[in-house]
Amino acid sequence: MQFYLKILAFFILLFSSVSADDKNFENKWSLYTGTFDFSDEGAKSTLYGVQYINLNNHYDSFLGKLYPVTGFFLTVDNAKYIYKGFQTTYDKGSFNITPSFTPGLYDKGNGKDLRHVIEFKTEIQISYNISKKSEIALSYNHISNANLGDNNPGANSYMFNYIKKF
């Protein structure tokens, strides 16, 4: 229960600075599903997730514009990962390539033990613009504790995403 309260507080803080009066308000929501740790036959599990991308708040860097990303996923084995980080998008016409880096908190539930509560997710996503406000995508990520734990088993996952701009 305490984990869910932390998630609720996290999203309340995230959206508390958002103003409905902002005429240029634009963001994306991504709903996704896929296979968590597909490369470990004994630990793979279906996952479901949601991600928020704030397009109004970006940081210019040598990589391009970095947009804040916040998300959460849950596996059918009750493993949970809540994260906040950044992504950049490289527009290639109808296609987009989007790498991201999102540190977060992981709870194994009845799923794979990643050996530390702090984990780092690196991801690459390829999306196709089906309209001006919608995309479908395929993404791959790796989650690792970067040797913070006594062991670093990691997890590789792939997802199918539906992304909607509001």
Question: Can you say where each PLM-predicted feature lies in the sequence?
Answer:
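Outer-membrane beta-barrel "beta-signal"
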Residues: 44-50, 153-166
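Membrane-embedded beta-strands of outer-membrane beta-barrel proteins
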Residues: 48-52, 84-86, 124, 160
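Outer-membrane beta-barrel initiation region
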Residues: 20-57
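Residue-level signature of outer-membrane beta-barrel architecture
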Residues: 52-54, 74, 88-90, 128, ...
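Transmembrane beta-strand segments that form the barrel wall of outer-membrane beta-barrel proteins
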Residues: 28-37, 63-75, 98-107, 139-144
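Short loop/turn motifs that connect adjacent beta-strands in outer-membrane beta-barrel proteins
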Residues: 20-26, 56-66, 91-97, 133
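Cleavable N-terminal export/targeting peptides
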Residues: 1-26
